């Protein structure tokens, strides 16, 4: 970045940060007050929460023309995205390459994280952004209510509930400087059949070209809900969602290619197809004003099939056509809330989850004249079944002091079945080729017991201000794939054996303040420290030419500390709105062979700033700035010791978005430019193997919405 451009953007950040001198009462896009969130599993006012929670209205994201949830969340305070070779995963509070198992993503309280952590990416693309009512972000923790995998935090995506008659259509178009047209077409509506029965739907289709040549996504979303008011005390919601897409990609670029022309085709040719159906049931019963009961049951399935997967390597081409993954989660949750005193409640419940993952890996190549063919087939069937009980009490002693505390117990059983078949034909000096055809089978079963608890005293020191302290002990359970190791030396011993892993245990200490000062701006600040023990580490090389081997084991300890700051101000009777945020993270390995090293893929600083100005009730503009500081890539890891080295810097970058919104009667028009200054940045970097993926350059959008 040229110095003058960087100075301009930093100056604009500074301007926005000090622009609260004459601000009026905040009614910001990112709200921490007077909104309804589900941090207890039951809807309540945000004022009743005892810790800092960010609630983002879906309409505020939809009004900025985003085409995906990932694109929208990337601009949100405290959230980053990490790609360590599998795809992009949401990261919070510096989880790095553990982000896919240490940040829990939910839809209406149902987890969508996949079970196969070694090859899994949380399926954000399957979420229809136009069907989002709001997004609740709970930084750091949540183990008592949500179980394993919340060290970084919880993101709960609440979908729309529309019962009254409505119908709307929307058309969205997107393009890059060099072309790459794409768009979305959708309809949504609702019909109230009678006073006790209603139905809503949202159908969106999309066909989007990527920034890089050879990238395309096309498919559709179907989201439906049926609402049944059984009587005055109970209601039932039945949901069905379906997502299907076909994605084409062309793989990585070298650094030289990325610098010369980041839009050019990569070194591979891949086509994947994704199918994801979901069924859910949500039942509420209100016994009286004191006791509320909630039953949730759901089933979700995701299949990823590699229709074409080719990569050029060492003067040959390897084919993985026919490979794929399947992830199925079935669950039930029984929750109760007792409001036993004024502003005091007790929540308790039981959860069951059966999570199954299947992996099919097919690799084929030939290298004439020596290798006629080499075909490797790996089949894995992994299951985790868990039973959990939990309780959380919040007691309001007086108008100044509230104490919250809770605990969770989780019992889990694991089963992993693995099959590996190796087929090879090699030419030698003998007249006939050598034929190898061997199959290795392995299975293992494990049981685990895990506990979590938290305590949070909250002090209301003024009419507008709250101060809280929180201690939480949580856990990140191993995944079934991590219970299987492979020997380095055979010598007649079985190639596979079970690993004796413990869950990762973390302790989080948090101090937060939320206030509304002098009647002109809101202030929110959080300080946290997280120490994680028994982190699961990895040794080996599954692709070694001398024989694949790997080992999962508990050894590492990490510590993460940080600061999260959010501000927002309004001017001119809410016509001019400013927003600012700053997140600072210091994430390091604090024990073991890599003691003192930074956790890869984690930026120390993320800053956001923005303004919105309404010229009148029908026309408004916005500008958003997002900054990520540099981070270390994965470097290389010694397969015998686990020592990291040669971790190169991933460059820092600014993103600048501008846009407008215009309303005319029932028509709404959105238009804007994302990455206005065409900043070049990497969404994936492997400097050792010279592999890079480039983020989207300057792109333009326009959208039309019409409500009948």
Give the location of each predicted region.
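Short acidic/polar hinge/loop motifs at secondary-structure boundaries
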Residues: 110-139, 160
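Gram-negative outer-membrane beta-barrel transporters
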Residues: 341, 396-403, 411-412, 522-533, ...
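Extracytoplasmic beta-strand/coil segments of soluble accessory domains associated
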Residues: 70-111
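Transmembrane beta-barrel wall of Gram-negative outer-membrane proteins
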Residues: 168, 177-207, 211-250, 270-292, ...
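Surface-exposed extracellular loop regions of Gram-negative outer-membrane beta-barrel proteins
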Residues: 246, 252-260, 356-370, 413-438, ...
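N-terminal periplasmic "start-of-domain" segments of outer-membrane beta-barrel proteins
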Residues: 32-64, 89, 223
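Conserved C-terminal beta-signal and adjacent last beta-strands/turns
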Residues: 190, 325, 393, 469, ...
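Outer membrane beta-barrel strand-and-loop segments of large Gram-negative receptors
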Residues: 320-338, 378, 386-390, 496-502, ...
């Amino acid at each position: 970045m040229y110095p003058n451009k960087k100075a301009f953007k930093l100056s604009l950040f500074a301007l926005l940060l000090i622009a609260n001198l004459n601000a009026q009462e905040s009614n910001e896009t990112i709200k921490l007050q007077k909104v309804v969130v589900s941090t207890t599993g039951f809807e309540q006012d945000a004022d009743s929460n005892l810790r800092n929670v960010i609630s983002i209205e879906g309409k505020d994201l939809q009004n900025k023309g985003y085409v995906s949830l990932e694109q929208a969340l990337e601009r949100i305070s405290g959230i980053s995205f990490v790609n360590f070779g599998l795809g992009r995963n949401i990261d919070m509070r510096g989880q790095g390459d553990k982000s896919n198992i240490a940040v829990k993503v939910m839809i209406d309280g149902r987890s969508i994280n996949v079970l196969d952590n070694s090859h899994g990416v949380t399926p954000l693309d399957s979420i229809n952004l136009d069907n989002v009512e709001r997004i609740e972000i709970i930084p750091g923790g949540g183990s008592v209510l949500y179980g394993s995998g919340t060290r970084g935090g919880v993101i709960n995506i609440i979908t729309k509930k529309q019962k009254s008659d409505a119908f709307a259509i929307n058309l969205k178009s997107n393009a890059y400087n060099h072309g790459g047209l794409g768009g979305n077409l959708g309809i949504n509506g609702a019909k109230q059949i009678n006073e006790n029965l209603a139905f809503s739907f949202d159908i969106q289709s999309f066909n989007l070209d990527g920034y890089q040549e050879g990238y395309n996504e096309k498919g559709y979303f179907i989201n439906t809900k049926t609402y049944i008011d059984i009587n005055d005390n109970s209601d039932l919601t039945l949901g069905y969602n379906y997502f299907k897409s076909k994605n084409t990609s062309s793989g990585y670029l070298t650094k030289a290619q990325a610098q010369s022309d980041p839009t050019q085709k990569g070194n591979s040719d891949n086509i994947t197809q994704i199918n994801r159906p979901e069924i859910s049931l949500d039942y509420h019963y209100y016994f009286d004003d004191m006791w509320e009961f909630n039953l949730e049951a759901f089933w979700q399935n995701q299949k990823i099939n590699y229709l074409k997967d080719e990569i050029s390597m060492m003067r040959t081409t390897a084919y993985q056509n026919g490979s794929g993954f399947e992830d199925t989660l079935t669950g039930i949750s029984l929750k109760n809330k007792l409001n036993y005193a004024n502003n005091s409640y007790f929540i308790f419940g039981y959860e069951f989850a059966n999570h199954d993952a299947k992996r099919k890996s097919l690799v084929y190549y030939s290298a004439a004249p020596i290798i006629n063919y080499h075909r490797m087939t790996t089949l894995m069937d992994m299951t985790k079944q868990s039973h959990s009980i939990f309780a959380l009490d919040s007691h309001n002693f007086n108008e100044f002091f509230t104490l919250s505390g809770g605990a969770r117990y989780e019992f889990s059983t694991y089963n992993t079945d693995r099959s590996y078949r190796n087929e090879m034909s090699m030419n030698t000096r003998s007249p006939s080729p050598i034929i190898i055809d061997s199959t290795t089978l392995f299975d293992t079963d494990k049981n685990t017991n895990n506990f979590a608890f938290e305590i949070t005293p909250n002090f209301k020191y003024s009419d507008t201000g709250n101060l809280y302290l929180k201690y939480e002990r949580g856990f990140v359970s191993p995944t079934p794939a991590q219970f299987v190791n492979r020997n380095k030396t055979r010598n007649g011993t079985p190639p596979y054996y079970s690993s004796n892993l413990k869950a990762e245990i973390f302790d989080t200490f948090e101090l937060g303040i939320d206030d509304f000062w002098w009647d002109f701006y809101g202030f929110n600040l959080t300080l946290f420290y997280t120490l994680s023990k028994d982190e699961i580490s990895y040794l080996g090389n599954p692709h070694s030419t001398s024989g694949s081997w790997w080992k999962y084991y508990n050894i590492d300890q990490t510590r993460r500390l940080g600061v999260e700051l959010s501000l927002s101000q309004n001017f001119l009777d809410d016509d001019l709105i400013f927003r600012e945020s700053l997140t600072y993270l210091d994430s390091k390995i604090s024990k073991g062979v890599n003691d003192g090293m930074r956790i890869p893929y984690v930026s120390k600083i993320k800053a956001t700033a923005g303004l919105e100005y309404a010229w009148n009730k029908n026309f408004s503009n916005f500008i958003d700035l997002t900054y990520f500081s540099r981070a270390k890539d994965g470097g290389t890891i010694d397969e015998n010791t686990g020592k990291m080295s040669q971790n190169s810097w991933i460059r820092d970058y600014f993103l600048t978005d501008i846009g407008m919104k215009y309303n005319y009667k029932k028509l709404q028009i959105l238009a804007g430019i994302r990455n206005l200054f065409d900043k070049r940045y990497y969404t994936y970097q492997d400097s050792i193997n010279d592999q890079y993926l480039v983020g989207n350059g300057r792109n333009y959008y326009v959208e039309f919405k019409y409500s009948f």
